[in-house]
């Protein structure tokens, strides 16, 4: 078994003494830093490598914290116009994950880089911490590598803002299998392809 396999098994047991201690120390450390900051290396190298990271020039890791909880509707003085059923402000749930938000914010912060993927690293009562893998499309090492130079094409600019990353596709309901059988896309297809002859019509 290689070293990465051991790291993977360690990361799985989040309630172990080692992981609990590490997460508490790291959460404190991350809170002292800026909201978005560059990490010198991934804190989960096994996970980063599985998602496409390589320890070579052109690849960058940024760490970000996102506040946990629901999303309050941004309306001036709480004034929502319309019917009472649509007047909710406080108890609304954002339909995309915190990881999506993290990718978007890092993508705006590093607008000259391309977001490849991201992963969860830590969380506490207030924040969730993510690490985002970015690629420099103008770097020669990236442009000459046939495994990653697809991301250089202009069509991949700000792919995180258009739901084209892994987590972005998940929240769009695009996929196959039991997780996606009740997704909006599947429901729309079913609605359009089901003949419904109601009694009173």
Swiss-Prot record:
Claim: Nucleus is one of the keywords in the record: yes
Bias (Basic residues): 169-179
GO molecular function (one): structural constituent of ribosome
Superkingdom in the source lineage: Eukaryota
Location(s), subcellular: Cytoplasm; Nucleus; Nucleus, Nucleolus
Principal cellular location given in the protein's record: cytoplasm
Cellular component aspect of the GO annotation: cytosolic large ribosomal subunit; nucleolus; nucleus; preribosome
Pfam families given in the database record: Ribosomal_L15e
Keywords tagged on the record: Cytoplasm, Nucleus, Ribonucleoprotein, Ribosomal protein
Example GO BP: cytoplasmic translation
SMART domains per the UniProt record, alphabetical: Ribosomal_L15e
Keyword set includes Cytoplasm: yes
Family classification: Belongs to the eukaryotic ribosomal protein eL15 family.
Assembly description: Component of the large ribosomal subunit (LSU). Mature yeast ribosomes consist of a small (40S) and a large (60S) subunit. The 40S small subunit contains 1 molecule of ribosomal RNA (18S rRNA) and at least 33 different proteins. The large 60S subunit contains 3 rRNA molecules (25S, 5.8S and 5S rRNA) and at least 46 different proteins.
General function of this protein: Component of the ribosome, a large ribonucleoprotein complex responsible for the synthesis of proteins in the cell. The small ribosomal subunit (SSU) binds messenger RNAs (mRNAs) and translates the encoded message by selecting cognate aminoacyl-transfer RNA (tRNA) molecules. The large subunit (LSU) contains the ribosomal catalytic site termed the peptidyl transferase center (PTC), which catalyzes the formation of peptide bonds, thereby polymerizing the amino acids delivered by tRNAs into a polypeptide chain.
Name of the protein in question: Large ribosomal subunit protein eL15A
Organism: Schizosaccharomyces pombe (strain 972 / ATCC 24843) (Fission yeast)
């Amino acid at each position: 078994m290689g070293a990465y396999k051991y790291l993977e098994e360690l990361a799985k047991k989040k309630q172990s003494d080692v992981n609990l201690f590490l997460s508490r120390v790291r959460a404190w450390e991350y809170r002292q830093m800026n909201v978005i900051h560059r990490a010198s290396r991934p804190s989960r190298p096994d996970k980063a490598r599985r998602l496409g990271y390589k320890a070579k020039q052109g690849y960058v890791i940024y760490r970000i914290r996102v506040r946990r909880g629901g999303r309050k509707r941004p309306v001036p003085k709480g004034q929502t116009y319309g019917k009472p059923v649509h007047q909710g402000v406080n108890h609304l749930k954002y339909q995309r994950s915190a990881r999506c938000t993290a990718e978007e914010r890092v993508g705006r912060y590093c607008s000259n880089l391309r977001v490849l993927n991201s992963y969860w690293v830590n969380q506490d009562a207030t924040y969730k911490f993510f690490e985002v893998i970015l690629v420099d499309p103008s770097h020669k090492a990236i442009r000459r590598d046939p495994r990653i130079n697809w991301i250089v094409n202009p069509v991949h600019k700000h792919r995180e803002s258009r739901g084209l990353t892994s987590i972005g596709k998940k929240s769009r309901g695009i996929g196959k299998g039991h997780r996606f059988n009740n997704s909006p896309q599947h429901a729309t297809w079913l609605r359009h392809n089901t003949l419904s002859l109601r009694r009173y019509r």
